[in-house]
């Protein structure tokens, strides 16, 4: 049975070059529907409640623009999100080459390199038009410390898995940070107790010396 938690809101950002199918991927996940035609996105926000590993989450998904003229807006989008899905098209070598640019922008804005990022190669149903091999995608993701999947917004292949795994990555990072905080608190308490113990010993030794003099 799924259980609810107060911290079940997860904010995800979809990024990538223009025309790779970011909106198609998002809408397929949200509404089980493939959109053939749509206007270029500037910024659209979607919400979906889903159950992942017996926990209920509300996903707040930001579908962003890929156009160069909107680059200045990305910093704001990046700061508002916890996890990222970087999309390229397997039929477009240039969109694949842009992935590293988007990742570097995320790292720069957040000023850390442990960001949960899923890289996906969309349009896996168009294998006869492929310009980027699966192995190339896998190798780049491993090199840059990202998760990786190929997907098809049209056939829905791996769409659910992409978002589920990205949420898991976000939660794993949160748990890791929480453990570090608890460990630090524990060390601080031990250090404080050690100082108090030494001070008490010093006071007791002083009292003993005074008694001997008397």
Curated annotation (Swiss-Prot):
Source organism per UniProt: Dictyostelium discoideum
Lipid-binding residues (covalent, S-geranylgeranyl cysteine): 211
Lineage summary: Eukaryota, Amoebozoa, Evosea, Eumycetozoa, Dictyostelia
Cell location: Cell membrane
Superkingdom of source: Eukaryota
SUPFAM superfamilies on file: P-loop containing nucleoside triphosphate hydrolases
Protein name: Ras-like protein rasZ
Major site of localization recorded for this protein: membrane
Reactions that this protein is recorded to catalyse: GTP + H2O = GDP + phosphate + H(+)
């Amino acid at each position: 049975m799924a259980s609810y938690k107060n911290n079940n809101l997860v904010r995800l950002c979809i990024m990538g070059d223009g025309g790779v199918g970011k909106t198609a991927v998002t809408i397929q996940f949200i509404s089980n529907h493939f959109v053939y035609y749509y206007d270029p996105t500037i910024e659209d926000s979607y919400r979906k409640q889903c159950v992942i590993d017996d926990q209920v989450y509300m996903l707040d998904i930001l579908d962003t623009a890929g156009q160069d003229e909107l680059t200045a807006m990305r910093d704001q989008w990046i700061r508002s999100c916890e996890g990222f899905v970087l999309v390229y098209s397997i039929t477009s070598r240039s969109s694949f080459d842009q992935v590293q640019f988007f990742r570097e922008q995320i790292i720069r804005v957040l000023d850390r390199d442990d960001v949960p990022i899923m890289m996906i190669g969309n349009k896996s149903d168009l294998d006869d038009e492929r310009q980027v091999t699966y192995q190339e995608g896998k190798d780049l993701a491993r090199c840059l410390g990202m998760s990786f999947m190929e997907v098809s917004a049209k056939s829905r292949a791996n769409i659910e898995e992409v978002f589920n795994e990205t949420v898991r990555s976000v939660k794993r990072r949160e748990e890791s940070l929480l453990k570090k905080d608890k460990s630090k608190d524990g060390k601080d308490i031990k250090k404080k107790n050690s100082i108090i113990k030494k001070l008490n010993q010093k006071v007791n030794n002083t009292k003993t010396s005074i008694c001997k003099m008397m």
